[in-house]
Amino acid sequence: MSKKISGRVRGISYLLMLVYFASYIMRINFAVMIVKVCSEMQMQKSALAIILTGLTVAYGIGQVLSGIVGDKIKPRTMIIGGLALASVCNIAMFFAHSVILMTVIWTVNGVAHSMLWPPIVRLLSSTLDDECYSYAIVRVSWGSSIATILLYSVCPMLLRVMSWRDIILICAAIGILILFLWVIFSKKLFIHESSTGEAEGNTPANVNSTLPIPKYVFIPMILIMLGIILQGMLRDGVTNWIPSLLSESFGIAEEDAIFASVIPAIFSMVSFYVFDLLHRKVFRNEVFCSAVIFGGSLAFATAMYAVNMMLSSAVLSVLIVAMIIACVHGINLMLISVVPKRFAKSGKVATFSGLFNACTYIGAAVATPVFARIAEVSGWGMTILSWAIIALLGLAVCLGAVPLWKRFRREYSDN
């Protein structure tokens, strides 16, 4: 970046990264250990998938509601509520032993986490200019990758000496610690936050005016939302079942299969920086950039299908899956993090952030049980082929949205 980043911007970036880290630690921990949970509870993947589906459905619906509410109340307060409720849900999961009760608790957990992303985007968009926003949103996104790397690398070792329930309790403790850090340090970093939640001082000029959204933008919006649903199917659908794929296809031990999943998480962390750079320096259009990345996902998914059919290599499979997930996280960065900021003039950044992010979890809610069922009935070859089909559809809808999105950028958001 050409602009010097101030200490305050760095502080905002890394504090919100911790918040997002806590969200992932307390949200995906059960999914990371689901292979071990299936083994301990002696249940099929499809039977326990309802727990993950409950979270994703609640998270998706909650995103919309939290986005609307997030434009009306202080983002800082909303983040406190979300972290506190998520910590309570993780503690409650320690004591739950029936699938029904676990589903209820994890569904409430989804609601808790839905209260975090819209206020994060609103705080960043109302406080930072475009260049600082790009710097910050990449760092915030790192929080998800760091949490994923930590869970996938540490859980296999911990599962050898303790129950998965104990690990979830540890995650709750981490969430409570970060909650206290947020309460203490956010006061200093967002000291000028007004009653409506706007941070004054370094606020971009275009946030202070409210303009109606042109009607033609709803066409590319619908296409973008479809693209987000498709990337959600790939992101969570692929990530959640990597350990099962490795365990069932290559006979890798459950704990080792979980550990191998850390490789895609490392690739994803690097991808945030790479795709942000490509977007700013090369494509300069987040929707077209997403189309290109969907094309990359299609190529890698096709290669994965060929490897699965002919070579049966665990190492190569992990590397290709890592590239698929890295691509999908790049799409997520473009469509979930960058696109909502283009609506700053409407004064509804949190609303659009919640709406778009909800689409991710519509896709995830569909993909998690569907991929599990396809794998059980038709095998992993057909499951991998479905990834390629989804990537192709994502490429098509993003390309379809590009012309009107360019017009929207030119006439509204960049004007």
Language-model features: locations:
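Extracytoplasmic gate region of multi-pass secondary transporters
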Residues: 30-32, 219-272, 332
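Helix-to-loop junctions at the C-terminal end of transmembrane segments
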Residues: 63-74, 272-284, 375
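C-terminal transmembrane helical hairpin of 12-TM major facilitator-type secondary transporters
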Residues: 286-335
